[in-house]
């Protein structure tokens, strides 16, 4: 998986990898499909800026809602994008066969799966439709399973990441090269990535791209309230997150708000999930994201350790261009 750099030492320089070639994107940078946050407009902005935007399907009300989002994306960009399918118990009521049917009808070419891999009927339908399937994994074992069932790429999701990080606490600096050692398909590094220096490190470890969640949350195009984004940019650092729900084998990295601290104390005391369910529910987070902006006292935010590297809210284009420039400069330090 040789990474090639073309052009002069300036912004016209382009890093081409197996990911950019296979997906037809300019930059090997993915935007995480953050539930309750990412919408069609944000996906299109990422695509137009040169990366791969990913739409979370699980937070669409139904298949027709998903169709309307896909139509918006196609109105706003002619560049590649992906749709995320998250297979986990909390989303058991999502009618993914209908969602996949809509994706096929609307010409979606790339699917990201997370949680569990797609079951055989869905996977077979995806491959029959000619879709590229990417699976997000937190262990080498799961990555090998994804490869064995026909996934075309995997996201190696280190425990620095926001949201669901698995139960093994493997950081991206170990998980990425381990996946590179064991797999023959392209690897995308996720978890703790926020700048071009880290992107260069990921490429040096053998990855073919990087995956941004927290960095993309703090962008101008992200639809959550400016009050939320500004608060995080001003107050977050590398110590500002905490695991929650480990007792329920659903470990999730969150911004350490007052709500999370209270829920964590209950969890440590041996509470039932029902005792904290309302506090961590997506509908509660939506109220904070779009109505009151109260980060500390209303709902929870999936937030990664990369928050310590993010100090301002900038445009998606600025994120992409600055990361690429810094990555190329960093790699250039090692030119023979």
Whereabouts are the PLM-identified features?
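Low-complexity, intrinsically disordered/propeptide-like segments
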Residues: 4-5, 103, 125, 206
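Intrinsic disorder/low-complexity signal
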Residues: 6-7, 111, 293
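Exposed boundary/loop context
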Residues: 1, 17, 25-26, 151, ...
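Active-site entrance/lid segments in N-terminal catalytic domains of soluble metabolic enzymes
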Residues: 11-182
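Short, Lys/Arg-enriched N-terminal segments with co-localized hydrophobic residues
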Residues: 1-10
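Conserved active-site-proximal phosphate/metal-binding subdomains
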Residues: 166-188, 194-336
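Short pre-catalytic strand/loop immediately N-terminal to key active-site residues, enriched for Gly-Thr
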Residues: 30, 189-190
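Acidic, glycine-rich active-site loops and adjacent beta-strand->loop/helix elements
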Residues: 87, 159-160, 192-193, 215-216
